[in-house]
């Protein structure tokens, strides 16, 4: 396995290096689930490494290189198990693309995974505040003054998406929730009866009146998780990324929301499953995996992010959340 540096303990393995090369060193079908946020083509610059997918010369080169990663994922994921990808539509910029518009990044990713043999399993929209986007990006299409001037150029804000793909085959280790869902990840937790619903009142049944009017907690949680739009992901609930910024960074990273990670792990993994993030950044996925009793593996090319990921995982292993 070609790595620059590594941190390995009983439940976590972190590697500083090229994710595609590291994946080649893993045995077949050894990963239960993968979740990650890939470089968004050349939208962000993460490092000056030639191996960084974010430094592709254009979209065609990015997708050509990304397919190598997807093919390796198809080899290491267990049959019947899943890979989830966080993504969004990519803005077209007049200075770079010649026009103002959007690129269908999620659609391209779906085609990449299907070309590698995966089955397109699901998509969920993660709501984001358009005012926050407008303030951060100054996008013309979100400006109120543009609405007043010529609303033909106005657009909606850009949500996040979580695309999930399934590797064909029978799942040898079913993901079971025999007692339903007993916890909730997100804001505004639903209310309801936890555990078995009590027996109905015989008198009310005889009178044909309502009984068991209080909802079951697991049903309410599943209703929220099964929604095609997740309105309840806390956008600010992320790992502290301050320590991972270099002076040479052109743009800082935006770590994945912890609620989103936890929700996916709750739905699609068992305790002690091995969770992979091939673009681990500062360790958001490994940290949540450890918190939820999973084993985890993460790859990160950039040294400063890798070192911060190690610190974050060590703090979680030592139950010290002072920097999270």
Task: Describe the function of each predicted region.
Residues 1-308:
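Core catalytic lobe of class I
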Residues 108-109, 310-324:
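Class I S-adenosyl-L-methionine-dependent methyltransferase module
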